[in-house]
Amino acid sequence: VTIDPVSGFRVALRPEGAGRLLLFDAGGAPAGAIEAPPGYRLSHLVETPGRLLVVGQGEAPVDGWHDWHFAIDVRSATLTRAGPAY
């Protein structure tokens, strides 16, 4: 379990299947989940000073890369492709 520095929520990666992120509020209560983007399998969380990222391993390359960092927006329960993971 890792704390998102933006929201203060706790984020856990459940690796079964394509993977999903489980979200918990600051008190530890379940607050939702985020599924892997289509065509990706969630691999691991990456902590940076300003935000929490998750690496998605793609089935096919996008702009020459299979693996991408996705920014996690806990409040809207979305992932946004942020840059290649290498």
Residue ranges and their predicted role:
Residues 58-86:
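Short, compact, well-ordered microdomains
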Residues 22-23, 27-38, 80-83:
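Aromatic (tryptophan-biased) beta-strands that constitute blades/sheets of beta-rich domains
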Residues 1-16, 50-63:
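Short beta-strand elements that form the blades of beta-propeller/WD-repeat-like
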Residues 19-21, 67:
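Repetitive beta-architecture junctions, highlighting loop-to-beta-strand starts
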Residues 1-6, 36-48, 84-86:
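Repeated scaffold domains used in trafficking and secretory/extracellular systems
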Residues 4, 24, 72-73:
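Hydrophobic alpha-helical segments, especially N-terminal targeting/anchoring helices
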